[in-house]
Design a protein with these regions (language model features):
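Binuclear metal-dependent phosphoesterase catalytic core
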Residues: 36-40, 56-57, 73-75, 80-113
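Short coil/turn segments at beta-strand junctions that form active-site/ligand-binding loops
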Residues: 16, 57-58
């Protein structure tokens, strides 16, 4: 969830491209619920609420919603969640993640704050 559009403005001010999907706490109905992108030979799906069934047309699902970090492979699809900075759940620490893609490989590093 972005929640406040000023947060999005701050992210954009960092000078890097920003892709947003709408979360359950976001009021901007213009933001898409799902975005598919290809990077480094991999197909990614960005969506706030993770699907119950692994999609068959992507390699990686990047999601939020649970506020719990996740790095789990299901049905050949890698599910990644960086956790949450402001309101982590289930005893998880506040966290962010770094995602690097090179030669069709993913390097995922969770960073506790």
């Amino acid at each position: 969830d972005v929640c406040a559009e000023r947060i999005l403005d701050e992210l954009r001010a960092a000078g890097r491209p920003v892709t947003v999907v709408r979360g359950n706490c976001d009021s901007n109905s213009e933001w898409p619920l799902v975005v598919d992108v290809a990077r480094g030979g991999l197909r990614f799906r960005l969506e706030h609420i993770p699907p119950d069934v692994p999609p068959d047309d992507v390699d990686v699902v990047l999601h939020g919603h649970t506020h719990v970090p996740r790095n789990e492979k299901r049905g050949g699809v890698l599910f990644l969640n960086p956790g949450c900075v402001t309101r982590p759940n289930q005893g998880a620490p506040a966290s962010v993640a770094w995602l690097e893609i090179a030669n069709g490989k993913i390097k995922w590093r969770l960073v506790d704050l």
